[in-house]
Amino acid sequence: MAIITTNSDYFAHRYEVIIPFVVSTICSIVGIIGNGFITVIYGTEWVRSKRLPTGENLMLMLSFSRLLLQIWMMVEITYSLLFPIIYNHNAMYKLFKAISVFLNYCNLWFAAWLNVFYCLKIVNLAHPLFLLMKQKIIGLMPRLLSLSVLVSFSLSSFFSKDILNVYVNTSVPIPSSNSTKMKYIFMINVLSLAFLYYMGIFLPLFMFIMAATLLITSLKRHTLHMENSTTGSRDSSMEAHVGAIKSTSHSLILYIINALALFISMSNILGAYSVWNSLCNIIMTAYPAGQSVHLILRNPGLRRAWRRFQHHVHLYLKR
C-alpha cells in the first residue's frame, strides 16, 4: 500500500492566496453564468412543455450538473484558501472531496451519453446491435441517466473512507521564536485513490472514444461516397459529422486534462498548497466554464437566446 504523507505549511506569501483565488473566482463566475444560462433556457422549456426532446434533456442535465460542480468548487476553493482550519478538518476534507468526485463523475457520464446519443443519431451503421441501440436509446435514456447517477454516488462514497486523511500539527516550533506554527499532514493512499478514481471514469471515457471513432469512420465512409458521386461537395450530413467530431474531440480533450488535474489535486503529490496545486484548481474551475461557452457558441438556438439575453441586459443597463 503506497502512502503519500505531505507536511504543508499554510501560506508563506499573501499572493499565494490572492492570485489563485481571484483567477478561480473569475472562472467560476463565467461557468455559473454560462451553465446557469443553459439550465434556465432548457429548464424553462421543460416547465412550459412538460417534456423535452432527448438531446435537449441531456443538455439540461449536463449543464445543471456542471452548474452544481462550478458552485461546489467555488465553495471548496474559498474554504481551502481562506478558511483552512475548517477545510482541513478530516471529516470536512473528505466530504468536500467525495462530493467533488461525485459531481465530476455525473458530469462525465452525462457528457458521454450526450455524445453517444448524437453518434447514434448521425451515424448510419448496418450492425444489428447498433440498429437496436438506435431504436431503443430514447426510451432507455432516463434509466441510463438514473443508473449513471447511482454508479457515481456509489463510487464516490468510497472517497469518504480512509483513502484521504488530513491531520493538523499545531506544535511545530518556529526557529528563533518561542511560538509554534500549524502544519497540515495529508496521508493519501495513492494506489486506492488511483484505482477507484480511474475505475469511475474508465467506462464513460471509453464511450466517448467509441463515439468519436464511429463518427470518424462514418465521416470517412461518407466522404468516399461523396467523392464517387457526381457532386463531390459537402452536404448537411457531412457538416453534421464534422460538427459532432469537433464537439466530441473538444469535450474529450478538456475532460482528460480536467481529470488529471483533479487526480493531482486530490493526491497532493505536488504539495497541498503548492503553485502546481493552485494551477490544478484553476484548471478544474476553467473546465466547466469553457464547456458552457463551447455549448453556447456551437448551438444555434443557444446563440440566439444568448444574443436576446445580452440585448435585454443592455436595455436594462441603459435605463
Swiss-Prot record:
Function: Gustducin-coupled receptor implicated in the perception of bitter compounds in the oral cavity and the gastrointestinal tract. Signals through PLCB2 and the calcium-regulated cation channel TRPM5.
List of glycosylated residues: N169, N178
Protein name, per record: Taste receptor type 2 member 40
Extracellular topological intervals: 1-17, 88-97, 158-189, 273-281
Spans traversing the lipid bilayer: 18-38, 67-87, 98-118, 137-157, 190-210, 252-272, 282-302
KW Glycoprotein (keyword) present: yes
InterPro entries, A to Z: TAS2R
Membrane topology: Multi-pass membrane protein
Anything else known: Several bitter taste receptors are expressed in a single taste receptor cell.
Subcellular location: Membrane
Species lineage: Eukaryota, Metazoa, Chordata, Craniata, Vertebrata
Gene Ontology BP terms: detection of chemical stimulus involved in sensory perception of bitter taste
Source superkingdom: Eukaryota
GO molecular function annotations of the record: bitter taste receptor activity; G protein-coupled receptor activity; taste receptor activity
Major location (coarse): membrane
Cytoplasmic-side segments: 39-66, 119-136, 211-251, 303-319
Organism: Mus musculus
Pfam families assigned: TAS2R (PF05296)
Gene Ontology CC entries for this record: membrane
Name of encoding gene: Tas2r40
Keyword vocabulary terms for this entry: G-protein coupled receptor, Glycoprotein, Membrane, Receptor, Sensory transduction, Taste, Transducer, Transmembrane, Transmembrane helix
Family the entry assigns: Belongs to the G-protein coupled receptor T2R family.
